[in-house]
């Protein structure tokens, strides 16, 4: 299947809870209502969508690979869903903003990566879900993702709890380059600075703000995503 072709092992899929949303318009609805949940419960959880006309609801995720997104402590927050049919839009569909799911305050994989980030004193930021899962499978467990969006201050503050050494390993395309530049700018604006005294060329005392973090950018081979690099040659990623 798709995930096996992308290099995932069954135990990895199980570890990350990766699943599949069937193509039906009410499969999720029927499954959870049979367990006692109401349509309102499912709307609030972001699993179904209210119809704009005629009333009723329908499944949000259909014929997609589902990546559970968890809070830092492992608690479920929402889903990221990748299309299997290339004609479906959008390519990636996330849970909507809810009380449980605030995308800008979550990092995919942090629940699994936080111990390794602290132990290695280094966090690697990648773009997509597979870019997290494949490195973890191959033993590189300090990798997280902002889920395709630009880094936010809240996400960087999350990482600061575990390490201030951050590597940006975003896709080697135009969009990835822009995301890298945005990430560097957010890091520059967000991470702590200390005021140091120094002398300018005229011998006058001045204050300098020095970033209290080590933020670096790694260059990926052209046309390759992080998961592809890891599968081709783990030593190259290391």
Feature locations, PLM:
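Terminal amphipathic helices with adjacent charged low-complexity linkers/tails
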Residues: 11-24, 217-218
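Toprim catalytic domain recognition across nucleic-acid enzymes
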Residues: 148, 160, 169-173, 181-183, ...
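C-terminal or mid-to-C-terminal helical accessory/interaction module adjacent to the motor/catalytic core
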Residues: 194-238
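Phosphate-handling DNA/RNA-contact segment within nucleic-acid enzymes
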Residues: 22-166, 180, 190
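Short secondary-structure boundary/capping segments
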Residues: 139-143, 183-188, 230-237
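Switch/connector loops and helix/strand junctions flanking conserved nucleotide-binding motifs
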Residues: 175-181, 224-229
């Amino acid at each position: 299947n798709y995930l096996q072709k992308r290099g995932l092992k069954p135990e990895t899929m199980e570890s990350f809870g990766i699943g599949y949303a069937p193509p039906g318009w009410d499969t999720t609805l029927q499954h959870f209502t049979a367990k006692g949940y109401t349509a309102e419960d499912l709307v609030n959880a972001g699993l179904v969508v209210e119809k704009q006309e005629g009333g009723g609801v329908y499944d949000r995720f259909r014929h997609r690979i589902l990546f559970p997104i968890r809070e830092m402590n492992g608690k479920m927050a929402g889903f990221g869903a990748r299309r299997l049919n290339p004609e479906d839009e959008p390519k990636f569909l996330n849970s909507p903003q809810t009380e449980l799911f605030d995308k800008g305050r979550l990092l995919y994989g942090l629940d699994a990566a936080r111990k390794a980030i602290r132990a290695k004193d280094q966090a690697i930021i990648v773009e997509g879900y597979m870019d997290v899962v494949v490195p973890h499978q191959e033993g590189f467990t300090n990798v997280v993702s902002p889920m395709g969006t630009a880094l936010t201050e809240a996400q960087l503050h999350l990482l600061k709890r575990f390490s201030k050494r951050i590597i940006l390993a975003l896709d080697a395309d135009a969009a990835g380059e822009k995301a890298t530049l945005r990430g560097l700018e957010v890091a520059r604006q967000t991470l702590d600075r200390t005021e140091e005294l120094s002398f300018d060329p005229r011998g006058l005392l001045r204050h300098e703000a020095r970033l209290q973090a080590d933020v670096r950018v790694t260059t990926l081979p052209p046309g390759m995503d992080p998961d592809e690099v890891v599968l081709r040659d783990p030593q190259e990623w290391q």
